[in-house]
Curated annotation (Swiss-Prot):
Disulfide bonds: none annotated. Keywords: Isomerase, RNA-binding, rRNA processing. GO terms for molecular function: 23S rRNA pseudouridine(955/2504/2580) synthase activity; pseudouridine synthase activity; RNA binding. Responsible for synthesis of pseudouridine from uracil at positions 955, 2504 and 2580 in 23S ribosomal RNA. Residues 20-83 form the S4 RNA-binding domain. This is Ribosomal large subunit pseudouridine synthase C. Its EC number is 5.4.99.24. It comes from Salmonella typhimurium (strain LT2 / SGSC1412 / ATCC 700720). The keyword rRNA processing applies. Belongs to the pseudouridine synthase RluA family.
């Protein structure tokens, strides 16, 4: 088995990288290297800050000089990434906007935002492979694996802090499009129902409406009506797990092809109508936020994929 030995790297810590732990910083620098190996080189003193040994919990300061030793990466570990090279290349085609502070992409349905839970490939891993020179790439928020649409990534720690503050202060507006069962009543503009998250024995997350849950609110607007379905715009005020999916179900209008909260008869109707749909019809259509560097208010829209467009066209033609 061949191995590849990179050279020693000296990295000067910029102001926006200060405050993070050295172990977390090394994970962004040594992409694909197991955590166990990172802790091993820290323990053995192979990583130095300002020529001194440090502990994994050491917090970096602006101006620190970090010595990163050569790390041997086995060829067979690299081979494990190769099946995903096409997915990595495909990510380049779905970038909607990019500058020195942020990157925004139109996440495809079926791709997780993070590897893990049995998935070796996620959007963030793909972006790091696509942008090996990027010193910082972190998700600002998440989308469910089967949800497509606008996904915001920070390219600086200062940008991540600013955008997270906007999320906390409800300064970020997200708009989703969902195809739901039946005729959504126009007077139902808001669903307020507390949500409780449960973890099943299988490890699967299920969310249900419960008075013991966290306060949750979603606003709705009818976009288009069809014979047995409605396209609604959903704007979550809070950001709970599976919030839109559970709130539409609670309102009596589950989303098309939702394998956890959906309705199989509705899915069958869509299949028999010839829509060709096989994925969850939930799309993050737009995101409005204040740019962390310029202060400009931005609204970025993501077009629907061909599967969703085709489904709507078939339903329109059948009206």
């Amino acid at each position: 088995m061949k191995t590849e030995t990179p050279s020693v790297k000296i990295v000067a810590i910029a102001a926006d990288e200060a405050g993070q732990r050295i172990d977390n910083f090394l994970r962004t620098q040594l992409k694909g290297v197991p955590k166990s190996m990172i802790y091993r080189i820290l323990r053995k003193g192979e990583v130095r800050v300002n020529k001194k040994r440090i502990k994994p919990e050491y917090k970096l300061e602006a101006g620190d000089e970090v010595r990163i030793p050569p790390v041997r990466v086995a060829e067979r570990e690299e081979e494990a990434v190769s099946p995903h090279l096409q997915k990595v290349a495909a990510l380049a085609d779905v970038i909607l906007y990019e500058d020195d502070h942020i990157l925004v992409l139109n996440k495809p349905s079926g791709t997780a935002v993070h590897g893990g839970s049995g998935l070796s490939f996620g959007v963030i891993e793909g972006l790091r492979a696509l942008r090996p020179e990027a010193r910082f790439l972190e998700l600002v928020h998440r989308l469910d694996r089967d949800t497509s649409g606008v996904l915001l990534v920070a390219k600086k720690r200062s940008a991540l802090r600013s955008l997270h503050e906007q999320l906390r202060e409800k300064g970020m507006q997200k708009d989703y499009l969902a195809l739901v069962r039946g005729q959504w009543q126009s007077h139902v503009k808001t669903v307020q129902a507390p949500l409780l998250k449960n973890i099943l024995q299988s490890g699967e997350r299920i969310v249900r409406v419960s008075q013991e849950g966290k306060p949750s609110e979603t606003r709705f607007k009818v976009e288009e009506r069809y014979a047995f379905a409605t396209l609604v715009r959903c704007s979550p005020v809070t950001g709970r797990t599976h919030q839109i999916r559970v709130h539409t179900q609670y309102a009596g209008h589950p989303i098309a092809f939702d394998d956890r909260y959906g309705d199989r008869e509705f899915d069958q109707q869509l299949t028999e109508a010839g829509t060709g749909l096989k994925r969850l019809f939930l799309h993050a259509a737009a995101l409005k936020f204040t740019h962390p560097g310029t202060g400009e208010v931005m609204r970025i829209e993501a077009p629907m994929d061909n599967a969703l467009k085709r489904c709507l066209q078939v339903l329109r033609n059948a009206k």
